Amino acid sequence: MVKLRLKRCGRKKRAVYRIVAIDVRSRREGRDLRKVGLYDPINNKTHLNVPAILYFIERGAQPTRTVNDLLKKAGVLKDTGIPVVGTLVSK
């Protein structure tokens, strides 16, 4: 299964995160399938490759909770009520 998740880059005390499509069995710093965006939490900037993100989501990739929030904030995803993998759903 493929996930869209954050991969830490940058230097000490100055983290920048790449948004990558990666196999769930890979480590955080493991080899990614494709880089699809960049998130800078200090400057609060986000750069997204929207066609690539939609390509992976259409083929079943699940964004993590943080990436899902970033995509909603950027307007790429709508709040559809579909649970993200790793979240608790009460019935």
Swiss-Prot record:
Molecular function as annotated in GO: structural constituent of ribosome
Organism domain of life: Eukaryota
Keywords attached to this entry: Chloroplast, Plastid, Ribonucleoprotein, Ribosomal protein
GO biological process: mitochondrial translation
GO cellular component: chloroplast; mitochondrion; small ribosomal subunit
PANTHER family membership: 30S RIBOSOMAL PROTEIN S16, SMALL RIBOSOMAL SUBUNIT PROTEIN BS16M
Protein name as annotated: Small ribosomal subunit protein bS16c
Source organism: Pelargonium hortorum (Common geranium)
